[in-house]
């Protein structure tokens, strides 16, 4: 198989571009680096396309490796024909390769194996051949009666021959492939309650359920799997029996009028019922689960991306509230950079007196530290805490300018109990660390959420049922893409954030922080090369994603890669600008002047391709830009609504909390997320 051609066809990309990406990946370049700084080589593929290409590349390489192993094994057995070699080499899936290899695998001792040991294979081959002069099975079997070999009757001889024919049919790659395709197109997934009198559970819709394999939604597959795992449901796949047999007969019945044809048909039915159908059911369910899992993982990644890319509310003193009942509401005040200024614990749910005391305490903290925003975790007691916050803001008066936002606190408790949090806040109680995290999530969601395992953020469907390695890889890829799309200030970033930068890992990130602590702030990108264990290759991969606002070189605070500095300076010169104009934001007519000069001509003069030229232009026009600023800002409120306040026809601004197969859940500020059904979003579903 030509892997490059296969990938180009599958992804609908030029072979040259696919080949270039494969080479870049093999050379150790990261996906963000390739996507951003090698656009001319791959035709401006985005990071998600490159990740898909990398995944499929790995699969196809594994497929080719398995083909070699299978061919070698069959050849060693002296059974490799040119026809078989061609079929294996042209196989497009691992399942197809395994189907071809099935007859040649070392098997445990089966009924057919025992029959072969008794010398019944010639009888089986004779009957299966269905020649014109083939005797009746009972007559043919008489010659194979041999007491010494354990064949004492015609019935025993025919039973053994039937077992051999059944196994041969079961091992036939064409038969299995055809039945698998038929099951996927015409089979049904069925379920029923595992117990006679089932309780009313979340699985009640599946107590008597049937859906076509070809159209069953992914969320139903995962729900059935979970119900079966919990012992609530019995799940199986039904394939139309007679049609499946007819499909086999078309392949094994050679001469319908032959004396042995009925015997072969009976063996074929045994092959389907005893050997093929059980494994076929496993294969169909495995395929459905794999597809559903990939879909759910993709949806999880889709939900995670906007959560990470929420616009930051930077530069304001922020109060974080981690609501709770028995343990109270934990409070943390952080400055505009996220540094902790104050902490407290209040008990607004312990009666009116305690609630009034909580408002007084929080009011004092707000006045003391000039708090502008309050971030409220959306967990237990969030509703009561929000109501108290509204009363608190009202008590401060309209001139206070304080507003609040509900923040998704998923994973905050996981982070607060982690070694990372303990190292960052050794003097604070676990619960207070959660309040700090909630405050910072409003200030800079990305910088805070990278400290948490993405699986703990909880924005997916059935995420705990997913293959853990595959889920982690997909979500880590999303985090990496988001971090590098935004860029990282090398002088303020935490080690966990730096570890997500292209080309860096946890060890090198820790070295960056240590170097910064020992030598002071970085004053240029070049200085990053002085960090221990950060070599030339790592610098090439990370430099464009690290920002140094304090640098005298204005390009050090942009996404322009150092390798393109000369091109950027040449472009400025061609358009009549200087670096000072970049600092002052005086490049309003840059694109106009570039167009006047000629884009192609300018790219040639600068020694770069058009994609890089346009990227450089974008960075020069808005140095230090944050792509998150172009997205909808967090919803900041000063008052609270109740469900009873809603009326038909009202238009509300909300935050999408979760996207699932059947729609999207939206927080509109009434303590209960509203469902926008897929029928309201899409024309087809």
Regions found by a protein language model. Give the residues of each.
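Accessory alpha-helical DNA-binding modules that contact the DNA backbone or grooves
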Residues: 30-31, 42, 46-148, 485-630, ...
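Short, conserved beta-turn/loop elements at beta-strand boundaries and strand-helix junctions
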Residues: 659-664
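Duplex nucleic acid-engaging cores and interfaces of nucleic-acid transaction enzymes
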Residues: 49-52, 59, 63-320, 324-428, ...
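Generic start-of-chain signal for non-secretory N-termini
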Residues: 1-19, 26
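Short, intrinsically disordered, charge-balanced linker/junction segments flanking boundaries
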Residues: 679-685
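Short, acidic/hydrophobic/Gly-rich beta-strand patch recurrent on exposed beta strands
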Residues: 332-334, 665-670, 675-679
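OB-fold/S1-family RNA-binding modules
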Residues: 242, 271-279, 402-489, 494, ...
């Amino acid at each position: 198989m030509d892997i490059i051609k296969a990938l180009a066809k599958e992804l609908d990309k030029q072979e040259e571009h696919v080949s270039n990406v494969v080479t870049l990946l093999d050379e150790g370049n990261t996906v963000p680096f390739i996507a951003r700084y090698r656009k001319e080589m791959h035709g401006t593929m985005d990071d998600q396309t490159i990740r898909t290409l990398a995944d499929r590349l790995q699969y196809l390489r594994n497929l080719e490796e398995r083909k070699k192993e299978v061919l070698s094994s069959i050849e060693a057995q002296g059974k490799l024909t040119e026809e078989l070699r061609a079929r294996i080499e042209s196989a497009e899936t691992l399942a197809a390769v395994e189907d071809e290899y099935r007859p040649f695998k070392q098997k445990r001792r089966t009924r057919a194996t025992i029959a072969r040991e008794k010398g019944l294979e010639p009888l089986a081959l004779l009957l299966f051949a269905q020649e014109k002069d083939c005797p009746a099975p009972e007559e043919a079997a008489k010659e194979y009666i041999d007491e010494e070999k354990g064949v004492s009757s015609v019935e025993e001889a025919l039973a053994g021959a039937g077992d051999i024919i059944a196994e041969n049919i079961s091992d036939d790659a064409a038969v299995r492939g055809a039945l698998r395709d038929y099951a996927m197109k015409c089979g049904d997934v069925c379920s029923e309650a595992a117990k006679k009198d089932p309780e009313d559970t979340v699985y009640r819709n599946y107590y008597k359920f049937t859906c076509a394999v070809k159209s069953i939604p992914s969320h139903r597959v995962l729900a059935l799997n979970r119900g079966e795992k919990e012992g609530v449901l019995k799940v199986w796949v039904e394939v139309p029996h007679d049609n499946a047999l007819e499909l086999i007969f078309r392949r094994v019945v050679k001469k319908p009028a032959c004396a042995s044809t009925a015997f072969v048909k009976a063996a074929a039915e045994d092959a389907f019922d005893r050997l093929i159908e059980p494994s076929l059911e496993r294969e169909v369910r495995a395929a459905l689960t794999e597809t559903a899992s990939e879909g759910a993982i993709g949806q999880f990644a889709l939900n995670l991306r906007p959560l990470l890319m929420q616009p930051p509310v930077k530069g304001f003193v922020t109060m974080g509230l981690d609501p709770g009942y028995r343990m109270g509401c934990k409070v943390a005040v952080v400055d505009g950079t996220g540094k902790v200024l104050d902490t407290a614990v209040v008990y607004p749910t312990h009666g009116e007196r305690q609630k009034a005391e909580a408002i007084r305490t929080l009011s004092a903290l707000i006045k003391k530290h000039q708090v502008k925003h309050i971030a409220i975790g959306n967990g237990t007691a969030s509703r009561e805490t929000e109501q108290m916050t509204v009363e608190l803001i009202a008590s401060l008066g309209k001139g206070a300018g304080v507003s609040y936002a509900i923040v998704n606190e998923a994973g905050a408790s996981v982070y607060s109990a982690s070694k990372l949090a303990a190292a960052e806040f050794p003097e604070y109680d676990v619960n207070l660390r959660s309040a700090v995290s909630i405050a910072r999530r409003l200030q800079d969601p990305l910088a805070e959420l990278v400290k948490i395992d993405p699986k703990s953020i909880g924005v997916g469907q059935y995420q705990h049922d997913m293959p853990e390695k595959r889920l982690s890889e997909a979500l880590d890829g999303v985090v990496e893409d988001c971090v590098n799309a935004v860029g990282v200030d090398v002088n303020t970033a935490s080690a966990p954030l730096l570890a997500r930068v292209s080309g860096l890992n946890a060890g090198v990130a820790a070295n960056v922080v240590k170097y910064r602590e020992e030598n002071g702030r970085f004053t240029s990108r070049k200085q990053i090369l002085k960090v221990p264990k950060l070599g030339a290759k790592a610098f090439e991969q990370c430099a464009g994603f690290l920002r140094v606002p304090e640098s005298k070189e204005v390009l050090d605070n942009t996404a322009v890669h150092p390798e393109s500095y000369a091109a950027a300076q040449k472009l400025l010169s061609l358009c009549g600008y200087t670096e000072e104009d970049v600092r002052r934001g005086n490049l309003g007519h840059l694109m106009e002047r570039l167009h006047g000069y000629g884009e192609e001509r300018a790219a040639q003069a600068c020694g770069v391709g058009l994609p890089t030229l346009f990227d450089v232009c974008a960075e020069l026009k808005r140095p230090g830009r944050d792509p998150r600023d172009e997205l909808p800002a967090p919803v900041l409120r000063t008052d609270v609504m109740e469900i009873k306040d809603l009326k038909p026809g009202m238009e509300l601004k909300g935050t999408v909390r979760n996207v699932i197969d059947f729609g999207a859940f939206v927080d509109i500020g009434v303590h209960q997320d509203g469902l926008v059904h897929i029928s309201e979003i899409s024309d087809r579903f």
